[in-house]
Amino acid sequence: MDLASVNGEIPGIGRDEKLLLVCVRGKRGYFLQNRMKYYGYKNTVVLEGATSFNDVKVKNAQAAVPPAEVTRVKGLGFLFDKRTQDRFNGRVITRNGKITAEESRAIAQAAELYGSGEIAMTSRLTVEIQGVPFDNIEPLREFLAQNGLETGGTGSKVRPVVSCKGTTCQYGLIDTFALSEEIHEKFYHGYHDVKLPHKFKIAVGGCPNNCVKPDLNDLGIIGQRIPQVDLEKCRGCKVCQVENTCPIKVAKVRDGKVVIDDSICNHCGRCVGKCPFKAVEAHQDGYRVYIGGRWGKKVAQGKYLDKVFTTKEEVLNVVEKAILLFLSLIHISEPTRLDVIS
């Protein structure tokens, strides 16, 4: 029985009848049992892990999906579940890991109607609907589209953009939500039909805390706050609040004045505003861009570009140039990091 068809009284089945629910996987049987209970069917029992009971057969049980179809739906964001022969896990795109309550309800309803009822998060912050039968893939996609959602996030393309919560976090130096959403529209959607040499991952971090590991992505962006010291206002205090605040200890009082070593400062901005005499009030906000990061079987930290960019437009331009550079390597079969050829 299709869960989606249980929307009230079931024709031909009385609410007081005793019913045996036979299911290859017990989970769906229990979801159906709960759904039927909601509509007044309270005399039900679930038989787990069975394909038949007497003359009752489970439709399409263990029907294998052709390899060509497995490949095709993978391109739509549905990955084959190795525990089964006809179930897939579908990835719902979230833009940057942030969804509305309405979208969340739609995803939960889709999981119940077309999947196993389970939902998981991926490392790229997409929402994965588990246990979708092959025949339910297109109905699921149509249902999601009606609610402004889409599946995807697979293949040798620009992958879903990830972002930390820098927009709301106390340490965030840039609006990570706005920037990642713009990157999502311009490059995830804008380059959706462009086949790259390998998947291309982008991450946006609000500060040097690196919570989403931007430097381990093909391209990473990290918010920056570059402090500017007014030496005339510095009194060389024995207990310097700027020095005490610096988490990586690159601010030091030398010869009666505070000095910040810019060559090793990570521009977290924690020291800005901490001097009671306002010696470190001025600052420049910006974006540091890393290229060539990688994680997986092999791990490599990306290298940052020397320039700290001060406008969003500059950053978007760099992102596009990096993707185009990556695209120029389409003839190379071996996955290549950008920093290797930059």
Predicted regions and their residues:
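Rhodanese-like catalytic fold shared by cysteine-dependent sulfurtransferases
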Residues: 1-63
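Intrinsically disordered, low-complexity polar/charged tails and linkers
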Residues: 63-87
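Small-residue-enriched alpha-helical segments and adjacent helix-cap loops
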Residues: 65, 90-239, 263-264
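Short beta-strand elements
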Residues: 78-82, 218-223, 287-295
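Short, flexible, solvent-exposed loop/turn segments with mixed acidic/basic and small polar residues
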Residues: 79-84, 115-121, 252
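Iron-sulfur cluster-binding cysteine motifs and their immediate structural context
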Residues: 239-260, 270-286
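A hydrophobic, small-residue-rich beta->alpha segment in the mid-to-C-terminal subdomain
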Residues: 285, 294-329
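Single conserved hydrophobic/aromatic residue that forms the stacking wall/gate
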Residues: 330-341
